[in-house]
């Protein structure tokens, strides 16, 4: 159990942090009101703060920790690479090996490029799509989150929506005029937008499952119709699988739903918890990237040996242990029990999610961004604090997904469900 008194060290650290770091945090989603707890360590399914409080963690660093925190296989791979050096500025065999593994699971990827973040992956993918097609416009989904670069910070999910600022100052209007938006799960609206702009349209970029505004899952047939629409209109389809990649299945949402896009972005899990991003696609598209072609992309830390080594380790482990069925069944079980709890309590909440992703939404089940905005954000925040006091760490935003890991035990899950029953 925690209380205001037991978070004193975190409160003091927050007061100091505010004088040195804007908002006291390095990413807005971490700005828990009235102040966040500061982490001292994490292991398995647990995370511990400066005051020694331990929590069962369903935030999991916002998705990367599919195996749980501090996994020994990943840790040993990083240690082994550190002994050889951690930054060279040259190509490595590791990059080739990881690229081959990834391409083997994603039929949309003939070739790929490593970068350092998910933001870089989507930024580079969109630049490449424009360079390949010679067109400037692209469509994103309302509430879709594709990182923090200028082109996509329009009605963005994640921390932007949590703070009530889904758009950002500092982005010229002339720049975002090329960013079009369509509501999720509305193929008619998407069709109209694509057909109206097809001669100027480079790509549609979409999170197959909206992970930063729910999660919100696709209605039956939506992704299939979107794939058909983009093919018929000669528009590239980009799947942003930074969250869903290697989480829903080894082949991500593409395997789970049976859809093959033209380009794919990855991150989070594929780096084993170290900074990484990936963008890949069909050979004729990817060969437009420098030095093979005229679309420029570069980065000092791209293909960082430690990140690549961690990525190989986590994919090897996933291949050997075949954990997805087990982890996804944990998610299925949690959602089923939460649905029973909500029904028994007679409250107007909904249970959302897929595979190892889940959430209780403080309102009716949303199918798009506008419906998600109708939720009770303040009610969720109060609930978050009650759960934290019960030793359960959920994402502090109503719009961020809860994740289950391979490390969560039956005891962890039952304790969590008991806390839900007591705190809703």
From Swiss-Prot:
Record PTM N6-(pyridoxal phosphate)lysine, positions in chain: 268
Record carries keyword Isomerase: yes
The keyword Lipoprotein appears for this protein: no
Molecular function as annotated in GO: glutamate-1-semialdehyde 2,1-aminomutase activity; pyridoxal phosphate binding; transaminase activity
Ranges in a coiled coil: none
Cofactor(s) this protein cannot do without: pyridoxal 5'-phosphate
Catalytic activity of the protein: (S)-4-amino-5-oxopentanoate = 5-aminolevulinate
Functional pathway: Porphyrin-containing compound metabolism; protoporphyrin-IX biosynthesis; 5-aminolevulinate from L-glutamyl-tRNA(Glu): step 2/2
Keywords for this protein: Cytoplasm, Isomerase, Porphyrin biosynthesis, Pyridoxal phosphate
GO CC annotation: cytoplasm
PROSITE patterns: AA_TRANSFER_CLASS_3
GO biological process: one example: protoporphyrinogen IX biosynthetic process
EC assignment: 5.4.3.8
Localization, UniProt: Cytoplasm
Pfam families xrefs: Aminotran_3 (PF00202)
HAMAP family associated with the record: HemL_aminotrans_3 (MF_00375)
Record NCBIfam families: hemL, PRK00062.1
Family: Belongs to the class-III pyridoxal-phosphate-dependent aminotransferase family. HemL subfamily.
Protein name: Glutamate-1-semialdehyde 2,1-aminomutase
Name of the gene: hemL
């Amino acid at each position: 159990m925690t209380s205001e008194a037991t978070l004193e060290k975190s409160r003091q650290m927050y007061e100091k942090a505010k004088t040195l770091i804007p908002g006291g945090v390095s990413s807005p989603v971490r700005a828990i009101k009235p102040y966040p707890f500061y982490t001292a360590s994490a292991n398995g399914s647990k995370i511990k703060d400066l005051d020694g409080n331990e929590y069962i963690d369903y935030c999991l660093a916002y998705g990367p920790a599919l195996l749980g925190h501090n996994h020994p296989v990943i840790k040993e791979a990083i240690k082994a690479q550190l002994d050889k050096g951690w930054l060279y500025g040259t190509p490595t065999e590791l990059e080739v090996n990881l690229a081959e593994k990834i391409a083997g699971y994603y039929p949309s990827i003939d070739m790929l490029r490593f970068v350092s973040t998910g933001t870089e992956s989507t930024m580079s993918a969109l630049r490449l799509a424009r360079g390949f097609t010679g067109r400037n416009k692209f469509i994103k989904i309302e509430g879709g989150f594709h990182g923090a670069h200028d082109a996509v910070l329009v009605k963005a999910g994640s921390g932007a929506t949590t703070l009530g600022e889904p758009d950002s100052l500092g982005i010229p209007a002339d720049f975002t005029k090329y960013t079009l938006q369509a509501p999720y799960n509305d193929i008619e609206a998407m069709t109209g937008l694509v057909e109206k702009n097809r001669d100027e349209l480079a790509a549609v970029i979409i999170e197959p499952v909206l992970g930063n505004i729910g999660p919100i899952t696709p209605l039956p047939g939506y992704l299939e119709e979107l794939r058909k629409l983009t093919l018929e209109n000669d528009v590239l389809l980009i799947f942003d699988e930074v969250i869903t990649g290697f989480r829903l299945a080894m082949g991500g949402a593409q395997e789970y739903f049976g859809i093959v896009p033209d380009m794919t972005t990855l991150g989070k899990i594929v780096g084993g918890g170290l900074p990484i991003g990936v963008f890949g696609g069909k050979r004729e598209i990817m060969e437009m990237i420098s030095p093979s072609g005229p679309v420029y992309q570069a980065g000092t830390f791209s293909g960082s040996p430690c990140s690549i080594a961690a990525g190989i380790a986590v994919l090897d482990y996933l291949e050997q242990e075949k954990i997805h069925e087990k982890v996804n069944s944990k998610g299925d079980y949690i959602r089923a029990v939460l649905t029973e709890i909500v029904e028994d309590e007679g409250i107007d909440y909904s249970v959302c999610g897929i595979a190892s992703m889940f959430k209780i939404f403080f309102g009716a089940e949303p199918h798009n961004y506008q419906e998600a905005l109708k939720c009770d954000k303040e009610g969720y925040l109060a609930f978050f604090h009650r759960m934290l006091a019960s030793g359960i760490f959920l994402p502090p935003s109503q719009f961020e997904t809860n994740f289950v890991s391979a490390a969560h035990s039956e005891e962890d899950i039952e304790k969590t469900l008991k806390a839900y029953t007591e705190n809703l």
